[in-house]
Amino acid sequence: MKLSLESIINDAAAWQAKGVALPKFDIAAMRKRTAETPQWVHFGAGNIFRGFIGSLSQRLLDAGLAETGIIACDTFDFEVIDKIYTANDSLTLNVLLNPDGTTSREVLAGVAEGLKADFSDCAAAERLRAIFRAPSLQMLSFTITEKGYAIRGTDGSLLPVVQSDMTAGPQAPRHVMSITAALLLERFRAGALPMAVVAMDNCSHNGEKLMKAVLEIAEAWVANGLADEGFIAYLKDESKISFPWTMIDKITPRPHPRVEKSLADDGFEGMAPIVTDKKTFIAAFVNAEKPQYLVVEDKFPNGRPALEKAGVYFCDRETVNMTERMKVTTCLNPLHTAMSMYGCLLGYTLICDEMKDEDIVNLVKRLGYVEGLPVVVDPKIVSPKAFIDEVVNDRLPNPFMPDDPRRIATDTSQKVGIRFGETVKSYIAAGKDLNDLVAIPLAIAGWFRYLLAVNDNGEAFEVSPDPLKEEFQSKLAGIVWNDPSSYKGQLSALLANESVFHVDYTKTPLAKRIEEYFVKLLAGPGSARKLLQDELK
């Protein structure tokens, strides 16, 4: 069996015999209607889109709650369209990885068409422009990763490709933000038609990031005489163009060899992953965890699909922000970082294996339930306690989720402030006793100990990339693992760094506790495990 329209229609019984759910709607009719009256375009045609956003479209189509599908575009890696979309008739075999090790399979057909957003191809460019002139278009959504919204480098200067787009104008844009601006200009010229422009990537205030990038490019075009003055007013008028904020949460790892083998063993052809020239790792199937959350600011000037019927939460901007803070400061991200520091020290390479370690599980539970929940931001639409329960009991232990603590340890200096400092600030604001905090100082001491690049057995390891790695390691100079007396107060200056930690720990009793924990972590083989056991009894 090969993933194709012909196969799922003519050999439906064979697919179903292998436990694969099939679409319940007329795919050809949906595609015809989408071509005539497009409603939803998506930029970023990778795995999170195919397995999550594409499945939302399928839910609505299956239930008769939508008549059109999504037009999926890739703005970065055109091989994905040729080798995955076109090769498989724009179908995806979605495999959900259940915590008990079982899987659920479904063919997703919610994508009507796969396009290349390639403005050097006249036909592709005109097809996109025609879609954006359609009065029926309601939404352009994105899953392009956080860096896709960046039009400036780390030094603050414009990326050369963006500078080139600003000078050349909207005819042949190359950067995804320039392409977005060009298509919105097309819509403006077609009668200032309304629509929503929706970032769905996992970054704080994503709608604001998207809006600022598009506006900066548009303003350059106006200044260079390449677009009308009214274009800026159009982009800033929320009754015309909105940039809703969102919170997304779903882990969609690379295609897993075990999943590929199980599909091949069941007679599915063409499931081997490919790696494109741009290093996209992708296959005809997507594997992902079952839990998923999408919270969206309900600001859609031209209407929207009934996605609330597919499990999407719609609310105001403040609730989106609160849901994101709940996840990032309490219910998921702090747990990930704390367990990854000690996971690396204890030699783990899989998060699911860490969840079999009683000492690490005690750290995770203390951090989330005992220290985090009392000051959690409660968005009301999602229960923080239920969210943590799912993380601890289902998501982190899932043996099919091949997540690695070394990946999570990347860029920790950019994360310790939001993931731990905000909870400390909440304790201070509420007048709560900071001496009650054990897991947070353990996590921070664990990070400093991790930066010494020696595990709990005294073996060297490679510290994950981090923009402040060299700076912090240089300030830890002179500290020697297996020699607690080598600590001479080197942490004090670091703990006062409010820009990194979001709080000056030297003005709190926690600095002393972090230093005490750190010294104990220098005591030789087994000291990390002993510290966890002693403090989390």
Model feature map: region roles:
Residues 1-43, 47-537:
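Substrate/ligand-engaging "lid" and interaction regions
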